[in-house]
Amino acid sequence: MFCYQCQETAGCTGCTRAGVCGKSARTAALQDLLVYVTRGLCQLTTALRNQGEAIIPEDDRLVTENLFVTITNANFDDDALQARIRATLERNAALRSRLDGAWLSAAARWDGSGDWDDKAQAVGVLSTADEDIRSLRELITYGLKGMAAYNHHVNAYGKSA
């Protein structure tokens, strides 16, 4: 586990065994995995859009909701996180079938096979060895999560951003 998403992080360096907030290592791993499969979804929808193909609004909402549930203290329900990962993997498979996938990233190609705990470890925050790249990637991810939170609230009022 590694999480440094909130101001409560242990010693201002990140939580590594369990979150000060109560997040378990398992939940942190599932959140990392959900972000990973969502990254794949984004690559797939972008590729299809670049080919002039339409993407259904539900795909955009899936991205928003996936990112929203991974923000600080929003969702520690492992069953719900697993369901979201499965739903995203299913959607990724459907979108992938519309593309020549040879050039797709590992996130867009992953089909959910193998041990999810091992995969989460392999794609989690600390899987990026270069600290500068890791920090930049996380900064962008947290910015997107913040935008997703605002979009989630706009959608709650029946509007779209």
What is each model feature region?
Residues 1-161:
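Metallocofactor- and cofactor-centric catalytic cores in central/energy metabolism, strongly enriched
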